[in-house]
């Protein structure tokens, strides 16, 4: 048995390092959709209707009428290439009832695992570069890159994505659109193919903040209820009606639609996290971040430095917790109970049937190994292996449990820094210098000033060229994990966060980046109101 495990381990690692999922032909198109609704099927938009693109890990049934053929829900994977869901995700049904017309299912990193939307069985997603000639493609970010490009190109008014560690905000920052991740538990996850249950959050993308705010808070007609108020009994992580009312009662801006007048910035306190000013931060983004902060200050806002000591460990904790949950969620894909059955022989067949008991081993495991070898892409296999190891008895204490401890510390840092208390806590967090050892540097002992929002970049760089991304993926496939360094902390804490477009100037010329605002739990309504004002200010200034 041990010999068999050794052969399988060698086979898996060999496969992860050798197979690519994209081709030069596929890379020449933007490739933002996996499936589209035919144009002749789309009626003219009526009042209150809008075009909706849905990330292809969110279940849909027929496009816009029961007579039409259901679209597939592939998750960007060979395993689900022909899967048609018998039911529809709650969030899609909710948006249909508000006038959404589905235009297609968007491309993504397989099962939502990636930062550039290149780990997909349907070809890498790209965006046209602003810096150079239009033939040059740049990364669209991930994993909701297809949704971001669909909005940026004007093919959708609203796009749904999923944000596990930044998969809505990062593509929004790269493509120059707005990407919103609500508080964990606000929007239903029923019908979303899970990656990491404790982190997965449905997010929305649009060119402006207001269309997103109208869906979350309710329209100006005061008839359509905001999504924030809708509990889904089919989703165990959806906050109950009572909890929603209790949370909203402690917050502003939930009493009606977003005001038409800009939200006043005077006396609002924005925190600038010291730990986010990292060495890897692009000088052009650092300059634009500073310029945006200065502009807000000139309009009456207060800008103060704050310290979030534990967030420097957030990225490491995330890449322990998320793969661990993924390895469990993806165990059902075996080609027998769930997923496509692959019948063609693969190199795994020969490896499994080596040895004296080859036929017996073949009968036991060849179908399972063949399906998972052919069905999963490289990045998914990498995270499954990592997750399975961190959940093993040998690594549980040293990795998974410590990562969960870091997650609690990250959440505590955020709760201490915000002026508003977390409505899910019985008592507010307190900052105590005595809790920090003497070896901790002075900057980490800077007691957090209570702020309304945190202001920081969405990503440390602008969108890289796609050919450079693909080349780097070959040499160092985990280097892309660094792109999530500013988005992961809010995900670990379950906080609302939004990325708004910010123009930057670098050696290649003008480009787009994202400016991120993070709020306290369930402060989504005020966050959206402030984000609209900030987006307008940044657009005028930079």
UniProtKB/Swiss-Prot annotation:
Subcellular location(s) per record = Mitochondrion
Q: What does it catalyze? A: L-glutamyl-tRNA(Gln) + L-glutamine + ATP + H2O = L-glutaminyl-tRNA(Gln) + L-glutamate + ADP + phosphate + H(+)
EC number from the UniProt entry: 6.3.5.7
Please give the biological process terms from Gene Ontology that the record holds.
glutaminyl-tRNAGln biosynthesis via transamidation; mitochondrial translation
* Keyword Lyase set for record: no
Q: What is its main location?
A: mitochondrion
Keywords noted in UniProt: ATP-binding, Ligase, Mitochondrion, Nucleotide-binding, Protein biosynthesis
Q: Which Gene3D superfamilies match?
A: Amidase signature (AS) domain
Of the GO CC terms on this record, one is:
mitochondrion
Q: Where is the active site?
A: 55 (charge relay system), 143 (charge relay system), 167 (acyl-ester intermediate)
Any GO molecular function: glutaminyl-tRNA synthase (glutamine-hydrolyzing) activity
Q: Which InterPro entries match?
A: Amidase, Amidase_CS, Amidase_dom, AS_sf, GatA
Q: Which family does it belong to?
A: Belongs to the amidase family. GatA subfamily.
Purpose: Allows the formation of correctly charged Gln-tRNA(Gln) through the transamidation of misacylated Glu-tRNA(Gln) in the mitochondria. The reaction takes place in the presence of glutamine and ATP through an activated gamma-phospho-Glu-tRNA(Gln).
Cite the HAMAP family for this sequence: GatA
Can you state the subunit structure given in the record?
Answer: Subunit of the heterotrimeric GatCAB amidotransferase (AdT) complex, composed of A, B and C subunits.
The protein's name:
Glutamyl-tRNA(Gln) amidotransferase subunit A, mitochondrial
Q: Which organism is it from?
A: Neurospora crassa (strain ATCC 24698 / 74-OR23-1A / CBS 708.71 / DSM 1257 / FGSC 987)
